[in-house]
């Protein structure tokens, strides 16, 4: 960016911030019926229906550290969406899996993205291009710590 681009509206970071905040706000309205935050939503989507995974692997998928994930997973467990079980061979290794209730909401949760997308006046091709651009940006600049 040029040096003269010092106004807030011209800052790339501000555009990311506003986009993220406003999109999450839209998701939040749909997530209320499931008593989920946006972070809880992405964590549930990141866990496969028949999958058991540890916190480190899950954290790498969603770009969250264990300090953020641990309290979130406790809340999701209280709500009946996930189980947290310790490995018999290594009690430090906590395995996360979806419960039946967690599996049952996977489909309705996956439909939320479509509902949010429909709120924007955006062509499908435009959305695909934006997603690919953002995916390339994330892949290039942010490493998942697996």
Swiss-Prot record:
Boundaries of each HTH marR-type domain copy?
9-139
Give an example GO molecular function. Answer: DNA-binding transcription factor activity
Q: Any idea where this protein resides?
A: Cytoplasm
Instruction: Please give the coiled-coil regions recorded for this protein.
Output: none
The UniProt annotation gives the DNA-binding region as 55-78
Q: Where does this protein chiefly localize?
A: cytoplasm
- A GO-annotated cellular component: cytoplasm
Query: What's in the keyword line of the UniProt record?
Result: Cytoplasm, DNA-binding, Transcription, Transcription regulation
Keyword check for Transcription: yes
Per its UniProt record, what Pfam families does this chain match? Staph_reg_Sar_Rot
Family (UniProt): Belongs to the SarZ family.
Name of the protein this chain belongs to: HTH-type transcriptional regulator SarZ
Tell me which species this is from: Staphylococcus saprophyticus subsp. saprophyticus (strain ATCC 15305 / DSM 20229 / NCIMB 8711 / NCTC 7292 / S-41)
């Amino acid at each position: 960016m040029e040096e003269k681009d010092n106004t807030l509206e011209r800052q790339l970071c501000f555009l990311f911030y506003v986009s993220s905040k406003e999109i999450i706000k839209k998701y939040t309205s749909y997530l209320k019926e499931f008593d989920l935050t946006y972070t809880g939503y992405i964590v549930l989507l990141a866990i496969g229906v028949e999958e058991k995974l540890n916190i480190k692997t899950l954290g790498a998928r969603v770009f969250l550290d264990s300090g953020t994930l641990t309290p979130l997973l406790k809340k999701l467990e209280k709500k009946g969406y996930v189980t947290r079980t310790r490995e018999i061979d290594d009690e430090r290794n906590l395995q996360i899996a979806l419960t039946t209730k967690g599996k049952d909401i996977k489909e309705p949760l996956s439909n939320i993205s479509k509902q949010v997308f429909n709120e924007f006046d955006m062509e499908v091709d435009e959305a695909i291009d934006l997603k690919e651009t953002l995916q390339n940006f994330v892949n290039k600049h942010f490493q998942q710590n697996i």
